């Protein structure tokens, strides 16, 4: 059940890692711009300088964190596809849970369980929303009536007529 074409697994990991880095850097840059602007001293010049400093300092770090998450998630997902032999939403849900657990391993088993639960629930919600959107979009374009391709099954009154007359008389 593949809705869209994706790269094969070795390249998918690199692609997802780069996409996550880009998303984290851009999103983190926007967030840090507001945060740096808000936390700077009064004055437009001070606030703009504080905003740019916050962007330069934190946006690459956030991008790197997102890249680690995306790379680990894709690696586990590709491993699940290889082991199970099929690509379905359960791979993504399990990959999200395992990614959360692995990234929280330094904080202890309680944090691992909590992060695994959050990762699994988050990915289950994302996969569920994707399935619902796919079903809703497919309901917008129902299959029309199917036409018979074999004209021998049609009665002679419904056969398409030729602009050059009735060709059956020469058979």
UniProtKB/Swiss-Prot annotation:
<keyword id="KW-1015">Disulfide bond</keyword>
<dbReference type="GO" id="GO:0005743">
    <property type="term" value="C:mitochondrial inner membrane"/>
</dbReference>
<feature type="compositionally biased region" description="Low complexity">
    <location>
        <begin position="153"/>
        <end position="163"/>
    </location>
</feature>
<feature type="transmembrane region" description="Helical">
    <location>
        <begin position="113"/>
        <end position="133"/>
    </location>
</feature>
<dbReference type="GO" id="GO:0010954">
    <property type="term" value="P:positive regulation of protein processing"/>
</dbReference>
<feature type="disulfide bond">
    <location>
        <begin position="9"/>
        <end position="78"/>
    </location>
</feature>
<protein>
    <recommendedName>
        <fullName>Mitochondrial import inner membrane translocase subunit Tim17-A</fullName>
    </recommendedName>
</protein>
<keyword id="KW-0811">Translocation</keyword>
<feature type="region of interest" description="Disordered">
    <location>
        <begin position="147"/>
        <end position="171"/>
    </location>
</feature>
<keyword id="KW-0496">Mitochondrion</keyword>
<comment type="similarity">
    <text>Belongs to the Tim17/Tim22/Tim23 family.</text>
</comment>
<feature type="transmembrane region" description="Helical">
    <location>
        <begin position="17"/>
        <end position="37"/>
    </location>
</feature>
<keyword id="KW-0999">Mitochondrion inner membrane</keyword>
<dbReference type="Pfam" id="PF02466">
    <property type="entry name" value="Tim17"/>
</dbReference>
<feature type="transmembrane region" description="Helical">
    <location>
        <begin position="63"/>
        <end position="77"/>
    </location>
</feature>
<dbReference type="GO" id="GO:0005744">
    <property type="term" value="C:TIM23 mitochondrial import inner membrane translocase complex"/>
</dbReference>
<keyword id="KW-0653">Protein transport</keyword>
<dbReference type="GO" id="GO:0030150">
    <property type="term" value="P:protein import into mitochondrial matrix"/>
</dbReference>
<keyword id="KW-0812">Transmembrane</keyword>
<dbReference type="InterPro" id="IPR005678">
    <property type="entry name" value="Tim17"/>
</dbReference>
<keyword id="KW-0472">Membrane</keyword>
<keyword id="KW-1133">Transmembrane helix</keyword>
<keyword id="KW-0813">Transport</keyword>
<dbReference type="GO" id="GO:0008320">
    <property type="term" value="F:protein transmembrane transporter activity"/>
</dbReference>
<comment type="subunit">
    <text>Component of the TIM23 complex at least composed of TIMM23, TIMM17 (TIMM17A or TIMM17B) and TIMM50. The complex interacts with the TIMM44 component of the PAM complex and with DNAJC15.</text>
</comment>
<comment type="function">
    <text>Essential component of the TIM23 complex, a complex that mediates the translocation of transit peptide-containing proteins across the mitochondrial inner membrane.</text>
</comment>
């Amino acid at each position: 059940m593949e809705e869209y074409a994706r790269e094969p697994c070795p390249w998918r990991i690199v692609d997802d890692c780069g996409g996550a880095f880009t998303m984290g850097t851009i999103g983190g840059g926007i967030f840090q711009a507001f945060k740096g602007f808000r936390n700077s001293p009064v004055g437009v010049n001070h606030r703009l300088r504080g905003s740019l400093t916050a962007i330069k300092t934190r946006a690459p770090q956030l991008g790197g964190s997102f890249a680690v998450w995306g790379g680990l998630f894709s690696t586990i997902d590709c491993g699940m596809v290889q082991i199970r032999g099929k690509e379905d939403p359960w791979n993504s849900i399990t990959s999200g849970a395992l990614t959360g657990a692995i990234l929280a391993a330094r904080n202890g088993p309680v944090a691992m369980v909590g992060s695994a639960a959050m990762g699994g629930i988050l990915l289950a919600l994302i996969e569920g929303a994707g399935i619902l959107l796919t079903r809703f979009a497919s309901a917008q374009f129902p299959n029309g009536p199917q036409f018979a391709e074999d004209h021998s099954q049609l009665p002679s009154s419904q056969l398409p007529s030729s602009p050059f007359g009735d060709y059956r008389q020469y058979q």
